[in-house]
């Protein structure tokens, strides 16, 4: 019971802190040197609009993961798990975590930042579907049972993402047709990128969660963040 409470608390803190990450990421990439890059000056001159957004999103995601990797390595050293980290990399669980990290890091994280840049914070609840997608993948791959409450939660998550994603663009008189009419091409691409991020993180959660059963969580997060940052 105590582990359950601790897990729920950590999950709530994770969601709260990730919301802060999103806010700071959005603000940071709208100021300073990023503005010059988006203006197509300097090293960004000659790049297409999509190439520019993709490149900067990848850089933004990489900065986040590199900083996180440094922190996890320091923490692992403090608690005496750095040796376990080095030994675990070339094991089967370690290789699984590396593959999962590539899916969830360079691919999903970059897609998430692309979504933020092209559609704004409206994509956050869409990307947050990763937990529901991970539960579905776990049911398919590992035959994990889904209780009635879990299924209801998954349905609510999908419904909430659709409602927030659509009505975030206003409630015009034309109904759904009017809502879609208010969306720009960039916004549509951003929403698609958010779904890709949710899918990537869902896969990472399901596959990486399996590997975490054989590797300590402190070691697993080190492997994940270092792989993603590199």
Where do the language-model regions lie?
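Hydrophobic, well-ordered secondary-structure segments
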Residues: 126-129, 133, 149-152, 189, ...
């Amino acid at each position: 019971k105590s582990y359950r409470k601790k897990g729920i608390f950590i999950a709530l803190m994770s969601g709260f802190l990730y919301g802060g990450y999103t806010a700071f990421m959005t603000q940071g990439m709208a100021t300073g040197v990023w503005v010059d890059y988006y203006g197509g000056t300097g090293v960004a001159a000659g790049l297409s609009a999509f190439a520019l957004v993709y490149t900067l999103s990848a850089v933004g995601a990489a900065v986040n993961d590199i900083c996180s990797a440094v922190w996890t390595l320091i923490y692992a050293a403090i608690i005496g798990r750095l040796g376990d980290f080095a030994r675990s990399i070339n094991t089967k669980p370690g290789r699984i975590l590396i593959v999962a990290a590539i899916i969830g890091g360079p691919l999903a994280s970059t897609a998430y930042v692309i979504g933020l840049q092209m559609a704004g914070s409206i994509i956050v609840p869409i990307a947050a579907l990763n937990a529901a997608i991970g539960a579905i993948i776990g049911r398919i791959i590992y035959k994990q049972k889904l209780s009635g409450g879990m299924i209801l939660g998954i349905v609510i998550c999908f419904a909430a993402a659709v409602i927030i994603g659509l009505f975030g663009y206003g409630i015009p008189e034309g109904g759904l047709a009017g809502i879609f009419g208010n969306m720009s091409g960039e916004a549509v691409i951003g929403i698609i990128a958010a779904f890709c991020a949710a899918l990537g993180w869902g896969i990472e959660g399901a596959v990486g969660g399996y590997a975490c059963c054989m590797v300590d969580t402190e070691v697993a997060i080190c492997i994940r963040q270092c792989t993603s940052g590199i």
